[in-house]
Amino acid sequence: MATKNKPNLSVQDVKLLNVNELTPLTPNVISRQATINIGTIGHVAHGKSTVVKAISGVLTVRFTSEFKRNITIKLGYANAKIYKCDNPQCERPGCYKSARSNTEDNPQCERPGCGGRMTLLRHVSFVDCPGHDVLMATMLNGAAVMDAALLLIAGNESCPQPQTSEHIAAIEIMNLKNIIILQNKIDLVKEAAAQEQYGQILKFIQGTIAENAPIIPISAQMKYNIDVICEYIVKKIPIPVRDFTSDPRMIVIRSFDVNKPGSRVDEIKGGVAGGSILKGVLKIGDEIEVRPGVISKELDGKIKCSPIFCRIISLFAEENELQYAVPGGLIGVGTKIDPTLCRADRLVGQVLGSVGKLPEIFVALEVNFFLLRRLLGVKSDGDKQSKVKKLSKEDTLMVNIGSTSTGCRVVAVKHDLAKLQLLTPVCSQEGEKIALSRRVDKNWRLIGWGEIKKGTVLTN
């Protein structure tokens, strides 16, 4: 069966699909689905969501509580297509343009008297992370799916602000090398102040993973220099290497119940899982498994996991219907799962993939860890508070593994090895990176990172 819902997008047909020939820039893939994930990171109220809106035309703030307080709370997401005009007389950066993901593949160039057609170069998915310090765990979950990051720094405040440094540390943990720095709100400051802050930014990024990142002055509200961001996304962010031939695996970062109250029984739809495919290709009709699935406690206190088995009945990338989905941008997977299991993000942190091909479910981990020297983003009187204390037995920490956040207890520590007993089981594998946070002044603070050496498998 082929997709036909949008006449101006290229048609996908599962029968003609050859996974060995797919690339992240295959035309009938990027016509409908984003294949590169870019995160927006930075301090609270520095304009992350506004930049995403300026590039993609999509407002990522979806919840009333987010509107009222003007902050992002859940992970926002939006897709955008990036085009370049095929007329050689069309000068850069104006020849680059971005549009919503359901825009046709070769629109007319909008510059007066140009007459060229736009060529689709990239289809990107923005993961809009919260900048608020209390929401650090949400930001780390988003970092798990990023290929690159836009670091926002507001031009009307000194640099660095607390969460700016905390987010830089987080992307160093995730080993995210492709970074573009945006000096936002440039319309609010005089030229001398902007130059002075440019110096502060250069000093701040020295010795960090963002050391050689380009710095672009922009105004997201006035849409000033947005075309330059598009050009830099195309030129500075390499196309990630993707694995299309392995068994599919996807991490879930959002999940929904799409039914309205009062629906008739025959109208009820199954739950929807949103996330990013790490490897392999998902197709409509595939039999899938979700792990760890439903977690329950027995009477004797033993934890039991029942993986969920179901079929894929629809695939979407924003408003675009898909017949198959590839690794990269965020997609929605419509399933036959009971909607109550998916509502209000209940499936977040689970792993979805081919039946019997997913990693083990662990209840305890042995990790090789590294601690930061001092706490980031904490304003303290002296040096005493901000130093990171060593891990000790019976410490309670929070671990982020992929898009899962769970509490854990330190059972044993020796040099840079620790054994962690998890509060809830996770589906993971050896070699996966994890982030560690500790509770400081009622908030979780990033204290270090580690790598899973081995795990204790859950026995049902």
UniProtKB/Swiss-Prot annotation:
Catalysis: reaction(s): GTP + H2O = GDP + phosphate + H(+)
Top-level taxon in the UniProt lineage: Eukaryota
Gene Ontology MF terms: GTP binding; GTPase activity; methionyl-initiator methionine tRNA binding; translation initiation factor activity
Region (G1): 42-49
Record localization: Cytoplasm, Cytosol
Gene Ontology process terms (BP): cytoplasmic translational initiation; formation of translation preinitiation complex
Function: As a subunit of eukaryotic initiation factor 2 eIF2, involved in the early steps of protein synthesis. In the presence of GTP, eIF-2 forms a ternary complex with initiator tRNA Met-tRNAi and then recruits the 40S ribosomal complex and initiation factors eIF-1, eIF-1A and eIF-3 to form the 43S pre-initiation complex (43S PIC), a step that determines the rate of protein translation. The 43S PIC binds to mRNA and scans downstream to the initiation codon, where it forms a 48S initiation complex by codon-anticodon base pairing.
Protein name per Swiss-Prot or TrEMBL: Eukaryotic translation initiation factor 2 subunit 3
Originating species: Dictyostelium discoideum (Social amoeba)
Source organism phylogeny: Eukaryota, Amoebozoa, Evosea, Eumycetozoa, Dictyostelia
